[in-house]
Amino acid sequence: MFENLSERLERSFKILKGEGRITEVNVAETLKDVRKALLDADVNYKVAKTFTDTVKNKAIGQDVLTSIHPSQLMVKIVHDELTALMGGETADINYEGHPAVILMSGLQGSGKTTFSSKLANYLKKKKNRNPLLVACDVYRPAAIDQLKVLGESIGVPVYSEPESKNPVQIALNAIKEAKAKSYNLVIIDTAGRLAIDEAMMQEIAAIKEAVNPTETLFVVDSMTGQDAVNTAKEFNDRLDFTGVILTKLDGDTRGGAALSIRTVVTKPIKFIGTGEKMEAIDQFHPSRMADRILGMGDVVSLVERAQEQFDEEQAKKLQRKLARNQFDFNDFLAQIEQIKKMGNIKDLLGMIPGIGKAVKDMDIDDNAFKGVEAIIRSMTPKERANPDIINNSRRERIARGSGTTLQEVNKLMKQFEQIRKTMKTVAGGKFPGMMPGMGRR
């Protein structure tokens, strides 16, 4: 996430490394580099200029303590201004109402339907809401089917009227259904288009007027950069939405949309999508995002994700087994499942301070876990519970059953032994660590 921008900014700050104090000359030189980095990241030109002008005014004339290097002070100023640029404070979503109604808008391909389901799942699990998803895309039958499949996967019902071509009436009927069946949250997925057109705008505006939503959220693909900002402005001019959702942020190495959109539309970014899984959704925290952009990681979000998957009873059981050196492949498989639920592995590593740059060019693939899982699931229950009995003939059978090679099985057995030894020494810890060699090709 934003790796290219992070690297460029880090290079810019090196200009001040050899300086004893901040001057107008070295600040100008540094900020010239910073502005170019922002523009190359597809940040809006006016936003980039205003940002660097503000940083310059705050930096020049600053008294630098002897214990603080000029480059450190510049990083602090840039961090504070990046935070302000992205909204300053975390913007909560309004889910109060009987029912609360959230209207989703955006172009086709922005990830709107998927995010509607993610949001329903998030509010159901974290805020104890009882959501109803509504399929109001009357032009694409596949969109209704997609929402139904996603809804079923998270245990959330989907209201649809496949024969109807009136999205306004569908939305109104869905709200009646929600009231009748005590759903306290309605999330309306609307039709998208490949480009903005008048008919699309009139339709979504009519739905908004009819249902009077608690929130109107604009979903945008962050990887489209400046186009995302321009589209957001057009939607906001017509819809006056209440917040922005940035999807596909895990694949965005530049960051132009995240850094520009708040200033251009004066509406907060409320949530971000960070992967394909239903759990790959985070509330947007400007300060934490500034940390990540500046290569400081985001330990708070990492710990929060771990806590979400933390099962106290399971942890106590594992701790007892570790103390007795009884860690087996059943425990190993459970740890893999926990880590997978936390999100994209490369994204997780990027949250650790100093690691983001190191993993930037690594080929880290979540699918690598599939081979490991296949090997473990090809073991008998007795073998999983007693790894020491897995001799060479058993390994050959496991390799055949899992569609892998004997070498891959041997490699996993060796890794498992290393993990077992390591985990015994840290038996008092509760945080599931990254397993040596896992996920890397």
Predicted regions and their residues:
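Long amphipathic alpha-helical segments used for membrane anchoring, targeting, substrate engagement
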Residues: F2-E19, R288-R441
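Alpha-helical scaffold segments in soluble metabolic enzymes
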Residues: N4, R11, D33, I77-A84, ...
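Primarily NTPase-proximal linker/entry elements flanking Walker-type ATP/GTP-binding cores
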Residues: R8-C136, A143-S164, I170-T190
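Residue-level signature of catalytic and energy-coupling elements of molecular machines
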Residues: L16, D42, V78, L107, ...
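Short, small-residue-enriched loops and turns at beta-alpha junctions
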Residues: G109-S110, Y139-P141, K165-P167, G192-I196, ...
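Short, glycine/polar-rich helix-capping loops at beta-to-alpha or helix-loop-helix junctions
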Residues: P141-L147, A228-T231
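Conserved phosphate-handling catalytic cores of large alpha/beta enzymes
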Residues: L172-I175, K179, Y183, A195, ...
